[in-house]
Amino acid sequence: MTSYKIPQLLKQKTWEWLQNHSMGHRFDANGSKEEQFVGLLGENMFRIINDLPAKFEDGFDGGHDLMFMGQKADVKTMGRNVDPQPHYVNNFVGYQQHFDCELYIFCSINKRTDTFWICGYTDKQTLLTQSTFFEKGQKRYRDDGTYFINKAPLYEIENSKLNKLSI
């Protein structure tokens, strides 16, 4: 896994943009402002690392964020209070499985240290077959004993099952 420091200016611009816009375009489980902030910040960090401009646009993106390695890719970012570990999981909302996307790039943001981590990537078929699936409403426990209730059908894949990405 590779880490990068998040520029304060990008954080500020992302938060300000989200005050008047929403990234949620599904019929359910669109994420809170904080979750949308983490997602957009992660997507734009990945874009910048790959010498692409940051993107702040309204409307549905068609299910993918960018072209990467010749495929339609979606950047999925989780906010955490710690650095990611190989056994930590990445979440994929089941409502998105029919979107036009071929590749998923999983990232994490340590909110306490403003560090962006690229955890790895996988293709859609591998994600759907190698993940653990949980129904909406199921209780999910974390390493520290805390839990959350799934707001949507959820696939979880461990960082250790992802392909490594060197940029």
Each PLM stretch: what is its role?
Residues 1-69, 76-167:
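Nucleic-acid endonuclease domains
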